[in-house]
Amino acid sequence: MATTIQNNFRIRRNFGKINKIAEIPNLIAIQKFSYDKFLQADVPPEKRDDTGLQGVFKSVFPIKDFNETSSLEFVSYHLEKPKYDVDECHQRGMTYSAPIKVVVRLVVWDKDEETGAQSIRDVKEQEVYFGEIPLMTENGTFIINGTERVVVSQLHRSPGAFFDHDKGKSHSSGKLLYNARIIPYRGSWIDFEFDHKDILYVRIDRRRKLPATVLLRALGATPDTAKKDPVEFHGSAEEILKYYYDTETIRIEGKGKYEKDLVPDLLKGQRATRDIRDPKSNEVIVKKNRKYTESAIKKLVAAKMKSLPVEPEEVYTKISAEDVVDETTGEVLLEVNEEVTEAKVEELRKRNINEFKVLFIDNLNILPALRDTLMQDKISTPEEAIMEIYRRLRPGDPPTPETATNLFVNLFFNAERYDLSKVGRLKLNYKFGIEEPLENTVLTKRDILEVVRFLIDLKNGKPNKDVDDIDHLGNRRVRAVGELLENQYRIGLVRMERAIKERMSLQEIETLMPHDLINAKPVTAVIKEFFGSSQLSQFMDQTNPLSEVTHKRRLSALGPGGLTRERAGFEVRDVHSTHYGRICPIETPEGPNIGLIASLSTYARVNEYGFVETPYRKVEKGRVTDEVTFYSALEEEKHIIAQANAPVDKKGNFTEAKVWCRKEGEYIYVRPDEVDLMDVSPNQLVSVAASLVPFLENDDANRALMGSNMQRQAVPLLRTQAPLVGTGIEAIVARDSGVTTVAKRDGVVQSVDASRIVVKADVPTSATDVANEVDIYNLIKYQRSNQNTCINQKPIVKPGERVKKGDVIADGPATEMGELALGQNVVVAFMPWQGYNFEDSILLSERLIKEDVFTSVHIEEFECVARDTKLGKEEITRDIPNVGEEALKDLDESGIIRIGAEVKPGDILVGKITPKGETQLSPEEKLLRAIFGEKAGDVRDSSLRVPPGVSGTVINAKVFSRKGVEKDERAKAIEEMEEAKLLKDQNDEIKIIQDSAFQKIRRLLLGKEVTARLVDDKGEQLLKKGDVLDDALLDTVPQRYWGEIAVAGDVQDLARKIIENFEEQKELVKLLFGEKIGRLKKGDELPPGVIKMVKVYVAIKRKLAVGDKMAGRHGNKGVVSRVLPEEDLPYLEDGTPVDIVLNPLGVPSRMNVGQILETHLGWAARNVGLRLQEMIEKEWGADPLRKKLKAAFAGTEGGPVGERLAALIEDVPEKELPKLVQKLRRGMHVATPVFDGAREDEMKALMEEGSATLQSILFDGRTGEPFDQDVTVGVMYMLKLHHLVDEKIHARSIGPYSLVTQQPLGGKAQFGGQRLGEMEVWAMEAYGAAYSLQEFLTVKSDDVVGRTRMYEAIVKGENTLESGLPESFNVLIKELQSLALDVELLETPEAQAAREAAERDLGGGPLGAPRGAVASGEKSSA
């Protein structure tokens, strides 16, 4: 234990009370799991599921030609090894991808003309190259053209059926119009909607609407999909009505006397039209005009009444449910859906027909909407219905029954054109309670009929039927990388399918092989486009480890098939009750994307259907168990869920009589035995970034949002420091982000230096096996991240230490001791100081700059490319025309700057010359040519120079040259260095394997007697017969002869076997490194036309400066306003000056009190460290130290975590105690988890341990007087954000001008000028600064002639300003002329002469042509 404490182990006192039941799942699992499921690379082809890539191939193949005489079938696919590894792709700007090979089979059929039977004529199988597919790196990113990208998961509307109403907005009456929509994963949408007259309409693909009954009738005409269909339905009016309405049978008892069957279910809520009496007792059961109540209906049933009398007027409004036919004549007396009239009933009575069926419509609970729709509908047969649908979808095409039926069947019942996906099928089954197999992903007749039934029930106001909430997470699902890519791949394959079909029919199929048919270009193009330019494939935010993790866990509602910013309303963006534990309610951007981009909560995961799930503990009979299960938003719906902090005793029983719970988004108090589930942990409802904020529960939500977002912008510092007040999740973020190096296997550290760690792993092997038991971890040194921050790893283990699998052995950027460390712990005071902290400004101590506390390293990459131009080849060289030796002093003979050179703006990094076109030479130039030879004239200097605002040290240079181009000295030197590094790794690996193998042989031979003499190659005796082998004797024999030593038994065979195995392993290692060295030596793949490319990396140290933005973790941000010398700052009683002075007014109105609590707790933690330090200095001895440590780390009430820490402190040997205390000299580390943090009494107790006070007396550093009031002083964790003043400051005198308007470009990147808008012009006018304004609007902007004159005037020493005509005036004239307005400029003769003279000087064209224009990007000096 002792060794771990002194090295890579951090003890934190945890204030959490709630036991950790479940571990936080791997933070980037959503990305890795999804992509693995898509590729299924490690699954043998025959065992692959039909999802991802396999699913796409299966759904598109087999491809048949148009006559179906041949088909191309898919057999299997496999991925080959990627050409370059991750590092090489980074350096060379390549894509990290693997070739994909597909085995396809071409089958040619013979068709018998008469019988139509098919027989196989020919089968050809072949493996075809199918392009490359990008692979995911270990950390869940993709490397595309050398940059790391992340594919963000998309949150979109799940496929299925959705019901809604228009909220009364469509019609002036404010009536609710209900609608339904069936959304497939791909295919046509169906919309059903009621209008204000209660007619039900349907739209297909948002075309013109038809009465819904047309679609229902058309279902009857679909050719037999009914084999799969669960309902018999032929689309007649009678069937439609009977499907949706109950029927009643009316009997004619005589003239004006009618009866109906008593159906108890239909009576409820109806009114009796006369007194209903019990036939036996004659007592009145239901009085006239009263409703049939449940008790009355029971009495009727008890009285065994079979029928009820019906009033004639009631009969005369009923609707017939079927055709009533006179059987003798075959005449239809009463048509289906016809209103029953007195005349019709009389007609029936005359014909002796005494009963008929009517629809049960009571206009209360059951409305005549569908019957009315059927009346509106003029179509009577399914065939006509299908023709009508065809006319709506393809207006202008004359339909035939065949084409119409084909179109209709393809729309919804053909798996190639319509796909609900498993999710859609699952949702339909769930919604309508049907049990269709999930594999059936097309619509069935029953689905459509049930959607209409549900919609009618909604309209009728049936209980338990409600409209859907579109923002419920049961109706939104996540499409992760795998699925997004699967959709893209399908698009590519479908494009390819068209081409294949055409080729199959055009060419002679017998002579073709599968590879002649397949061209993989469309597929690779689609994949390339997706990774390169899709809205969801984003440039990874690599500022610090937290921003990487958050980016990979992000959910976006934008993107293809999602919402757009403009259209998204308020509801979509809002927090929904189902977000609890699934999507973080805090972390979302401010601005137009608020609520559309969210982050997964800490414990959330995405299930196979794409729904977000969160874990809960099972509760049985009021006792909480440790069984954890994941629930999606729909599954959770009916459960009663207790909070994680509900008080529970040791056995898991709730201690209180009522428990505060959630049910369906509401909060309620319930008895313990009613609770079903309980939260796993209090921080399960927030995201990773939010759970890094201590005392989050004491911050206002808006500020918590800013705090979460700003942590992602923290720049990794040169000297990292984990927070004194953390939340206990820091180590998890550091481990899962992939920036630290984590041990792959248990083992012992063999050697450590700054750039690599060698671990000898524990590999259990048999006596003779030799395994590769070496893990070499090459650390990343000073690499540039996407955001120009510095990625650098440093080891935190020592040789001889034991490491376990999963231990952090090297820290990365912004981590310390395996914990996330985004900022620094500094002593802050909340007080005003001379107005320098007005409006959130921050006052700093010079110490922070002197000691590099907030210094960060940024790495800029500069690229120089030598191309083959029309005029000749560009050359990278040291020999540059017109450049003095001083400027070349740091370039080597190849023209590339040396590593370690300090550079400033304007310095040459890479010397390059470009051939110049031959121009007419002036006499002076001819003279120069004659004197100095050819060289100077025909080339110009196009060297790569350091841009303004960058000064630093060159840390690396890389040279890439085309195959077949002679490598220069620098390239050779770099190559040799790389090769030496690889060889060193290879030799170390072999050496460790060798040591371990011969250690085994040594164990076998020790103590054995030699049975035969051993001689070496020269015949000299090494061992004589009878020698007994011991260590000393063995060491005299060279290892290569150990296999030759003859001893009794089979030891010699075993020794030889070990040596053989060792040789085999050695060859494997050499082979692996040989491949890498081979790749180093061969030329690089460069873009066309490029001969050579040089990349130079410059490291810039940025110290904290006035104007930099800083922030705490609670949304308390500010800008540095002044840096004060230490002696002027307020200081404490012991003389310590504070580091930062913050404005106390920043706290009350913003309500982020968490920062004050953090300050207090940090102060207590720091003081405990100081007290311990004092105890060591005064040599108190081990026992009091131990006691103090226990009191500080384990607290008074202990708890399981406290007990563990107390035991740990007890185990530390006496002489190690000072080392442990030394580690706490800056303060002890504490963790206060979100929503389960330190309580006030605990904080006070810790304060007392460190004898600290909540407020301190401060003294003014300038006068030495104490301030009037006590000041809150403490330790706060402050971050330096990525908005650095050095990167934003920018100045220009002359630079590039825009081509058309001749005005300076804008922005720092283009080296542009400052915009002078109309408001600035008003300001100048207000001051009457006419001459300055004239200058601004002419020569400083776009007056080309004036610019030249100005230059001349300055040269001649005159100071007059003659402005010319601004170029934008010419642009305006041209604009007006393009609108066919004849506008011309009238000039006085003098002005014209002056203009023409200027044009001659400039060599410009006529008026309006861009004169002396410079393409944007090229600098023009006036």
UniProtKB/Swiss-Prot annotation:
<dbReference type="InterPro" id="IPR007644">
    <property type="entry name" value="RNA_pol_bsu_protrusion"/>
</dbReference>
<dbReference type="InterPro" id="IPR019462">
    <property type="entry name" value="DNA-dir_RNA_pol_bsu_external_1"/>
</dbReference>
<dbReference type="InterPro" id="IPR007120">
    <property type="entry name" value="DNA-dir_RNAP_su2_dom"/>
</dbReference>
<comment type="subunit">
    <text>The RNAP catalytic core consists of 2 alpha, 1 beta, 1 beta' and 1 omega subunit. When a sigma factor is associated with the core the holoenzyme is formed, which can initiate transcription.</text>
</comment>
<dbReference type="Pfam" id="PF00562">
    <property type="entry name" value="RNA_pol_Rpb2_6"/>
</dbReference>
<keyword id="KW-0804">Transcription</keyword>
<keyword id="KW-0548">Nucleotidyltransferase</keyword>
<dbReference type="InterPro" id="IPR007641">
    <property type="entry name" value="RNA_pol_Rpb2_7"/>
</dbReference>
<dbReference type="GO" id="GO:0003899">
    <property type="term" value="F:DNA-directed RNA polymerase activity"/>
</dbReference>
<dbReference type="Pfam" id="PF04565">
    <property type="entry name" value="RNA_pol_Rpb2_3"/>
</dbReference>
<dbReference type="GO" id="GO:0006351">
    <property type="term" value="P:DNA-templated transcription"/>
</dbReference>
<keyword id="KW-0240">DNA-directed RNA polymerase</keyword>
<dbReference type="Pfam" id="PF10385">
    <property type="entry name" value="RNA_pol_Rpb2_45"/>
</dbReference>
<dbReference type="InterPro" id="IPR007121">
    <property type="entry name" value="RNA_pol_bsu_CS"/>
</dbReference>
<dbReference type="InterPro" id="IPR014724">
    <property type="entry name" value="RNA_pol_RPB2_OB-fold"/>
</dbReference>
<dbReference type="Pfam" id="PF04560">
    <property type="entry name" value="RNA_pol_Rpb2_7"/>
</dbReference>
<feature type="region of interest" description="Disordered">
    <location>
        <begin position="1392"/>
        <end position="1422"/>
    </location>
</feature>
<protein>
    <recommendedName>
        <fullName>DNA-directed RNA polymerase subunit beta</fullName>
        <ecNumber>2.7.7.6</ecNumber>
    </recommendedName>
</protein>
<comment type="similarity">
    <text>Belongs to the RNA polymerase beta chain family.</text>
</comment>
<dbReference type="GO" id="GO:0032549">
    <property type="term" value="F:ribonucleoside binding"/>
</dbReference>
<keyword id="KW-0808">Transferase</keyword>
<dbReference type="GO" id="GO:0003677">
    <property type="term" value="F:DNA binding"/>
</dbReference>
<dbReference type="InterPro" id="IPR037033">
    <property type="entry name" value="DNA-dir_RNAP_su2_hyb_sf"/>
</dbReference>
<dbReference type="InterPro" id="IPR037034">
    <property type="entry name" value="RNA_pol_Rpb2_2_sf"/>
</dbReference>
<dbReference type="GO" id="GO:0000428">
    <property type="term" value="C:DNA-directed RNA polymerase complex"/>
</dbReference>
<dbReference type="InterPro" id="IPR042107">
    <property type="entry name" value="DNA-dir_RNA_pol_bsu_ext_1_sf"/>
</dbReference>
<comment type="function">
    <text>DNA-dependent RNA polymerase catalyzes the transcription of DNA into RNA using the four ribonucleoside triphosphates as substrates.</text>
</comment>
<dbReference type="InterPro" id="IPR010243">
    <property type="entry name" value="RNA_pol_bsu_bac"/>
</dbReference>
<dbReference type="InterPro" id="IPR007645">
    <property type="entry name" value="RNA_pol_Rpb2_3"/>
</dbReference>
<dbReference type="InterPro" id="IPR015712">
    <property type="entry name" value="DNA-dir_RNA_pol_su2"/>
</dbReference>
<dbReference type="Pfam" id="PF04561">
    <property type="entry name" value="RNA_pol_Rpb2_2"/>
</dbReference>
<dbReference type="InterPro" id="IPR007642">
    <property type="entry name" value="RNA_pol_Rpb2_2"/>
</dbReference>
<dbReference type="Pfam" id="PF04563">
    <property type="entry name" value="RNA_pol_Rpb2_1"/>
</dbReference>
